[in-house]
C-alpha cells in the first residue's frame, strides 16, 4: 500500500514531448532541456537523458536528507561534501528497469558518524522512500 502524503509542500510540473528523443520544460521555465538516448543505447548522445536526470535528482535530494539528519544530530557537514550518483538501465522480465548507486563523500567526518548519517538519510529521503523495494539501490561511503 503506498504511503499517502500528509501535506503537499511543493508540486513540480514538467511538460515533455517526444519521449527519450524529445524536450522537457517546467511550467516556471527554469527547466528547458532537450533529451536524446545515450550512445550506449543507440542514440545520438547529444543531450541529457532520463537516467542522468534521475541520478541528479536522487543525489541532490539525498544530500538534502543528509543535511537534514545532520542538523537533527548536531553534526556539521563539510563544505566539500559530495555525492557521485550512477543510474543503470537494463532489461527485466517485464520490460526495463533501473538501478541506482550513490557514493557519498563526507571528508573529515568520522566514518562511523558519516555512515550513520547515510543510513538515517536513506530513511527520510523522498527518492529512497520511492525506490525502496522497487529497484536496487547501493549506498556507500567514499
Predicted segments — roles?
Residues 1-56, 63-142:
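Extended beta-strand/beta-hairpin segments
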Amino acid at each position: 500500500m503506498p504511503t499517502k502524503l500528509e501535506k503537499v509542500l511543493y508540486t513540480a510540473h514538467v511538460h515533455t514531448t517526444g519521449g527519450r528523443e524529445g524536450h522537457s520544460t517546467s511550467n516556471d521555465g527554469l527547466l528547458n532541456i532537450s533529451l536524446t538516448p545515450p550512445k550506449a543505447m543507440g542514440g545520438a548522445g547529444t543531450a541529457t537523458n532520463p537516467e542522468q536526470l534521475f541520478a541528479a535528482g536522487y543525489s541532490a535530494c539525498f544530500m538534502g536528507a543528509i543535511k537534514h539528519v545532520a542538523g537533527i544530530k548536531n553534526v556539521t557537514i563539510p563544505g566539500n561534501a559530495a555525492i557521485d550518483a550512477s543510474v543503470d538501465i537494463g532489461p527485466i522480465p517485464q520490460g526495463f528497469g533501473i538501478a541506482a548507486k550513490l557514493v557519498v563523500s563526507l571528508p573529515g567526518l568520522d566514518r562511523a558518524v558519516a555512515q550513520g548519517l547515510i543510513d538515517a538519510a536513506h530513511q527520510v529521503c523522498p527518492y529512497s522512500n520511492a525506490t525502496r523495494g522497487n529497484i536496487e539501490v547501493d549506498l556507500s561511503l567514499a
